[in-house]
């Protein structure tokens, strides 16, 4: 009681929704739809790739018809499994793209962000996409340092 889940003997309890009273005091009483899975594993959650399993469940791959593929299978990729590329979008300013990533396993991590496209500069930004520091961009690769569970926003122009 008081946590999101509890296992006792052969019983399992799982909290599916928690809701505040603002702006809707009856949100927890309305109709909701959930997708959840039980994912048994022998090793620690990090080694069992639990974050990847959750993404596969909640955001399945969608095939679309497209033009000629580029040299990469994605617009961007990282070389560390504990770094999750969360967002790739056009910059709010209309110039460049934003790539948002986070560290998922509570580990200080250095990763190489590989991007497809012709970009001249890379910046680390805050969540409002305001440039804070320039990053080295060489041959489509940007080295990014992430603190445990940190969200990092990179802008490429």
Where are these regions (language model features)?
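Terminal accessory/anchoring regions of large secretory-pathway or extracellular enzymes
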Residues: 3-4, 8-157
């Amino acid at each position: 009681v008081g946590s999101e889940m509890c296992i006792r003997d052969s019983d399992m309890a799982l909290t599916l929704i928690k809701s505040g009273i603002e702006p809707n005091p009856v949100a927890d009483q309305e109709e909701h739809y959930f997708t959840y899975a039980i994912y048994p594993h022998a090793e620690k959650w990090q080694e069992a790739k639990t974050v990847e399993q959750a993404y596969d469940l909640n955001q399945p791959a969608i095939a679309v018809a497209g033009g000629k593929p580029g040299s990469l299978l994605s617009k961007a990729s990282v070389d560390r499994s504990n770094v999750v590329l969360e967002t790739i979008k056009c910059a709010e300013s209309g110039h460049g793209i934003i790539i948002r990533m986070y560290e998922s396993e509570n580990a200080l991590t250095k990763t190489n962000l590989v991007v497809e496209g012709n970009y001249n500069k890379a910046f680390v930004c805050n969540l409002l996409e305001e440039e804070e520091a320039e990053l080295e961009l060489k041959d489509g690769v940007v080295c990014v340092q992430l603190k445990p569970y940190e969200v990092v926003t990179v802008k490429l122009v």
